[in-house]
């Protein structure tokens, strides 16, 4: 049996899509269904009673939970309405994946505070989501670059996740689960949360951590990596970024001498992680560390 509760997505995950009738929601719902994800309902206020690709659409999350067993949600709702959508999911469901970007920081803070109070798990916002190859995905990642295996990936960057996954797949290293934690300053699950799950997951033999400049998430991850029994390989993007300039993500900014690529690299290496300078170097390092050719 593939999958594990430790890594968030398994055969028992039954998901609804908030914003299923919108452009992004409808496109990615089709992709998720084709990959085998169990999408059991959609939610768009005012569109209840409709159907999309055989999936019934409801007006609210509560309506869905009254009629069927569902335990996860993925949100494609526009930023101004994302907080209300997230609150609705967090109230009723265990796992909420927020794809939406440009959510105001104050809204994100309220979402995370509510999720913490309710004991629920949030991935994102501004995330590509999560994929467990061979099981399903709750997200927007291109599925053809992923394959089943034992390498876990946790990342702040969607596109770099794809680059590393493609490198691993081409070299014959499949992935257990890949989690995008999101590129915003305020997110749900962080590096440490996901690393803990990978450490406990029998289906994961090693982990690739993809960080970037800004904040201290990688430094906090390093403090946990010291305790891990599984090898961790890391990459930090933004090494050439000038201080004070935001690079791509809202969270990718160096301020006050903290959050630099060099400080993150030093912390990770001191914790025992193998840090590479470019995605193409990851395969050789994994081969060397795991003793495979």
From Swiss-Prot:
Gene3D superfamilies on file: NAD(P)-binding Rossmann-like Domain, Succinyl-CoA synthetase domains
Recorded catalytic activity of this chain's protein: succinate + ATP + CoA = succinyl-CoA + ADP + phosphate; GTP + succinate + CoA = succinyl-CoA + GDP + phosphate
GO cellular component terms listed in the entry, alphabetical order: succinate-CoA ligase complex (ADP-forming)
Residues where substrate binds: 162
Binding site for CoA: 21-24, 47, 99-101
Catalytic activity, EC: 6.2.1.5
Biological pathway: Carbohydrate metabolism; tricarboxylic acid cycle; succinate from succinyl-CoA (ligase route): step 1/1
EC category name: ligase
Alphabetical GO biological process terms: tricarboxylic acid cycle
Disulfide-bonded cysteines: none
Entry-linked SUPFAM superfamilies: NAD(P)-binding Rossmann-fold domains, Succinyl-CoA synthetase domains
Endpoints of the signal sequence: none
Alphabetic keyword roster: Ligase, Nucleotide-binding, Tricarboxylic acid cycle
Catalytic site positions: 249
SMART domains in alphabetical order: CoA_binding
Function: Succinyl-CoA synthetase functions in the citric acid cycle (TCA), coupling the hydrolysis of succinyl-CoA to the synthesis of either ATP or GTP and thus represents the only step of substrate-level phosphorylation in the TCA. The alpha subunit of the enzyme binds the substrates coenzyme A and phosphate, while succinate binding and nucleotide specificity is provided by the beta subunit.
HAMAP family: Succ_CoA_alpha (MF_01988)
Protein name as it appears in the record: Succinate--CoA ligase [ADP-forming] subunit alpha
Lineage: Archaea, Methanobacteriati, Methanobacteriota, Methanomada group, Methanobacteria
Gene transcribed to yield this protein: sucD
